[in-house]
Amino acid sequence: MTAILPPWIVLDSLLHNWLLEDIGRGDRTTSALFPANSIEGTAKWIVKEAGVIAGLPIADRTFKLLDSNLSFIPQVPEGKLCQKGEVIAEISGNFDALLTGERVALNLAMRLSGIATLTKKYVDKIADLPVQLVDTRKTTPGLRLLEKYATQVGGACNHRMGLDDAVMVKDNHIAAAGGIAEAIALIRNSIPYPLTIEVETETLAEVETALQHKADIIMLDNMSLDLMRQAVAIIRQKSDRVKIEASGNVTLETIRSVAETGVDYISTSAPITRSTWLDLSMKINSNTRSPAGV
């Protein structure tokens, strides 16, 4: 599966804001050292610990918003597992753009690479089983599009990007509506017909109710493995159409056991909420310094 970047028209707006947040009234240090577009040079990005690389196209775009002529050449493809010391990008252009954009570009790539790295660890645990890992809406405000892109790079599939993607009837919806049957009935009377309905369940009785009212996807939330196996058996016996999703307290230690219950999807926020940044750095090649245009 190829990870798909959000449209640049959307990302550019985000990148502009993040650059403005860092630059403020101007990069005092760099502007004092180098008048705009006066000195050119080269730099490289280096991996300081093993991990899966994600976010190089976004780093490229970040720098190009500061200098459209800057050259950012990835040395590895997105999703590659790199080792400490590998060079992952070669950059050439004006020093003012290189130095001013360095932190924002690196921050994004480090964050996304950390997510992709942990995602791959989860995916590898279930790679030989007929189940798909999916992410959740537990994302950092403002970073959802990129964090979900990173889970794709790591081998997962995106769940809902937002509330407008599909209907998911969760425990609080059920409580507010008075029950699963009541919630589904109200929803079917108002949603566009192409939208699927997913229902969160915690008991076998709730699974039966969701089946009776023709939910498209049934989530088994925080169930024990034994209860999950029973729920899967009930659903498979009564419908070959309904998809089954397991969720809740999924860890690297438990994900394979969850997958072996026979569910179609396993959703977890862990690759995003529990990942750490992958350590990357940029090093200027001091011997390549030259006046711009020379």
How should each PLM-predicted stretch be described?
Residues 245-247, 282:
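Short glycine/threonine-rich catalytic loop with a Thr-x-Gly-x-Asp
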Residues 1-9, 287-294:
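Short, low-complexity, intrinsically disordered N-terminal peptides in bacterial proteins
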Residues 252:
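Cys/His-rich Zn2+-binding cysteine-cluster or related metal-binding knuckle/ribbon modules and their
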Residues 270-294:
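Short, charged, intrinsically disordered terminal tails
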Residues 222, 248, 270:
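Short secondary-structure boundary segments
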Residues 2-213, 217, 226-234, 243-245, ...:
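Acidic/glycine-rich phosphate/pyrophosphate-binding loops and surrounding catalytic core
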Residues 237-243, 285-290:
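Short acidic, glycine/proline-enriched helix-loop-strand junctions
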